[in-house]
Structures are given as C-alpha cells and as structure tokens.
Swiss-Prot record:
Protein name: Elongation factor Ts
GO terms under cellular component: cytoplasm
Disulfide bridge positions per record: none
Taxonomic source organism: Mycoplasmopsis synoviae (strain 53)
Free-text function comment from the UniProt entry: Associates with the EF-Tu.GDP complex and induces the exchange of GDP to GTP. It remains bound to the aminoacyl-tRNA.EF-Tu.GTP complex up to the GTP hydrolysis stage on the ribosome.
Length: 292
C-alpha cells in the first residue's frame, strides 16, 4: 500500500474515529476521496447504527448547564468508558447539552428533536455518532428545571462528568444553592427532606434503635431526648437536609441554608448508569474473537 493511502487511512480514522476495517472500506469505495469517504461512512452507518440499537449502553457521561433561573441535566450513554473519554464524544455531548438548554426542551422526546445544526437533530447526531464511533450512543434522560418566583437554582457538574446535581432553594443566592448541589453530588443521600421518607421506611429506621443500658429506668423525657438524638444521627445518613454539610461539617445542610436565609425546596442528582445493568466483558476474549 502506498504511503499516500496510509496517510489517508490515518487521517480518516482521526477525523471519524471509525474502525480500521470500516475506514479502508470507505476509502476503497470512494477511490480514496476522503470527503466522499466520510459521507460514505455516514450513509452506511445508518445501517450499522440500527444493528447496534439492541446493544446495551451503560457507560457514558452526565452533563449539566445552568443559570440561577434555569438548569439542565442530561445523560448520554456509550457502551464503554473508553469511548466516554473520547474527544469527539465529549464534543457531541457539549453540543447536545447547549442545544437542548437553549431550546428549552423539557422531555426526552422534545430533546431528541432539537436541532444541533441547520440540518441535524439530536437524534440524528446520535445515530451518526453510533455509526462513526462504532458503539451505541444514546441520550438516556434529561431533567429541565426552572426556578419558581422567589427561588434560585444551583447546578453542579463533577469534574469526572459522571455525577451532576441541581438544587432549588428559596431566596436569591445561587452560590449557596450550588454549594448544596455539590454536597448532593458527593454524598448521594436517599431522601431530600425528612417529609419525603415513606412511613414504612421511617418505621424501619426507628426499629434499628438499640436502647442503651438502663434506658427503661430513665424518665420519659430523657428517653425521648436520647431517641430523638439517635434518630437525628440516622437521618443524617439518608436525608440531605439533615446531613453534616461537607464544606462546614459543624452545620447541617438545613442550618447552612438557614444561615443564608434560604430553605431547601427540591434537589435532583444524576449519576452515569443508575439503574442500568452493566455487561462485564473479557477484553482478551473480545480481541481474540475479532481475529478469528
């Protein structure tokens, strides 16, 4: 093979991140015209993408974009963590996030129909990416939030792009709201408010109480105080508003907000792959199967 053809193969792989075999087929089918080969990959990729549609995509990233009054969290999945770190994949996620946020789409169905360019919707861009990258790429979910009057939003995206959170609080201090969103991302409590705990779950928590020595001999008022202190500690494990605040653990989240004249209204957290089954594959076996 000539040096020129090798250079074209290398360039096409860099520009499309397609598999080597697909790159060679595309160039051979287009007489080594690189722009035509890119078009060929896209056109033939629709068939490839359809074949991949039944595969499980449980890796990927979460993304977030927000202002004090509007916020968007979304999750884009790939099949492997390797692809999730790919520059082209991350550029796609950035474009999708910005486009969906700007369009104000509030459901997954609406988000998929948002235009990311003059000629392509989010859904079409994901199909193209599936074909070019070689893995199933999907927009799994979106959460669009708008602050109520007199409230403010705080949006946080962790540096690893695997966890994001949005918090709504009363007042106008978005920095305080963002700090609580960061806490939420890090601590992942089971509930936001004590009032969110179902009665059966609360009873389950209370049943775990082990009375200290001579508890029954203490006055009812003391027993109540001991039980209340124990319960607060347990709730601090599972309820956002009761947890010690990560930036100042002498305060609970609720107290931190109260000091800023704010109250917690709602909170949401996204983490990559929540609720999805993950397929464990043996890389060596996978490579061996490709060489047969």
């Amino acid at each position: 093979m000539s040096q020129n053809k090798l250079e074209l193969i290398k360039e096409l792989r860099q520009r499309t991140n397609s598999a080597l075999g697909d790159v060679k087929k595309a160039l051979e089918a287009t007489d080594y015209n690189i722009e035509a080969a890119i078009k060929w990959l896209k056109e033939n990729g629709i068939v490839k993408a359809a074949k991949k549609s039944g595969r499980l995509a449980s890796e990927g990233v979460v993304s977030a974009h927000g202002t004090p009054t509007q916020s968007l969290l979304l999750e884009v999945n790939s099949e492997t963590d390797f692809v999730a770190q790919n520059e082209k994949f991350m550029t796609l996620v950035k474009n999708v996030t910005e486009s969906v946020f700007k369009a104000g789409a509030s459901t997954l169905e609406e988000a998929l129909q948002v235009k990311v360019s003059d000629s392509e919707t989010v859904e079409q861009a994901l199909t193209d990416a599936t074909a070019v990258i070689g893995e199933k790429i999907t927009l799994r979910r979106v959460l669009a939030s708008k602050a109520k009057e007199g409230h403010v939003l705080g949006t946080y995206l962790h540096a690893n792009n695997r966890v994001a959170a949005v918090v709504e609080v009363t007042g106008s201090n978005s920095e305080v709201a963002k700090n609580v969103a960061m806490h939420l991302a890090a601590m992942n409590p089971e509930f936001v408010l004590v009032s969110d705990i179902p009665e059966d779950r609360m009873q389950e928590i209370k049943k775990a109480f082990e009375a200290p020595k001579d508890f029954d001999k203490k006055p009812a008022q003391i027993q109540e105080r001991i039980l209340s202190g124990w319960l607060d500690k347990q709730l601090g494990e599972v309820v956002l508003e009761k947890q010690p605040f990560v930036m100042e653990d002498s305060l609970t989240v609720a107290k931190y907000l109260a000091n800023a004249n704010a109250k917690l209204v709602s909170a949401h957290r996204y983490e990559v792959g929540e609720g999805l089954e993950k397929v464990q594959s043996n890389f060596a076996e996978e490579v061996a199967s490709m060489t047969k």
